[in-house]
A protein has these predicted regions:
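Charge-dense polyanion-binding interfaces
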Residues: 180-186
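Cell wall/extracellular polymer interaction/catalysis modules
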Residues: 13-157, 164-180
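Bacterial Sec-dependent N-terminal signal peptides
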Residues: 1-18
Length: 186
């Protein structure tokens, strides 16, 4: 019995640490896509929704330095359930309130209900409806600036939602760039 509890705790703790091998593979995939499709080759944004929502799981990846240059917590879609805090589900269906997986182009900047926001264009079948669904990058005042594990972050209606301070940092990176790739995976 004690062995099972210890094993569960070890698995639970380690599942909240980013898998760098996986991240490097996703970054390489993103870079290849950016080169082939004439997108920004300075950096991309990776979101690993396999991680606990209370840890950093949005990563700004520098293609030039081949490493993470910034990271912070990000919300996932709540769906129609009150129980999707740490086991996100994904959808491309309008009104599902779930996040979508896949590559997106970060599109135009605008001032929305939550301040500075960025529209997204889905580049894959799994996220082809993100613009129609109004899935965007935006801030929310209840999102933490830093990790809060083992607590959970608030959930969104499918949007890539970060804290106001982290949105300001993202905006500094994005506002003068074009065709930046956002890659959401699990």
């Amino acid at each position: 019995m004690y062995y099972m509890i210890a094993l569960f705790m070890a698995v639970n703790v380690f599942s909240h640490i980013p898998n760098m091998e996986k991240m490097e593979a996703k970054a390489a995939e993103a870079k290849n896509y950016c080169v082939e499709c004439d997108m920004n080759t300075k950096f991309c944004i990776l979101v690993d929704y396999s991680l606990h929502s209370g840890v950093d799981r949005l990563f700004v990846w520098s293609f030039e330095k081949n490493c993470v240059i910034d990271e912070y917590p990000v919300a996932h879609g709540r769906g129609k359930s009150k129980h999707l805090y740490d086991r996100p589900r994904f959808s491309n269906v309008p009104n599902s309130y779930l996040s979508s997986l896949g590559m997106c182009r970060i599109a135009e900047r605008y001032e929305g209900k939550y301040g500075i926001s960025y529209r997204l264009d889905g580049l894959e079948k799994s996220n082809s409806n993100v613009r129609e669904r109004d899935i965007v990058i935006h801030s929310f005042n209840d999102m933490p600036d830093t990790e809060i594990y083992p607590d959970y972050c608030p959930r969104s209606r499918g949007c890539v939602m970060v804290s106001e301070n982290n949105m300001a940092r993202l905006d500094d990176l994005l506002k003068d760039e074009q065709n930046v790739l956002l890659y959401i995976y699990k």
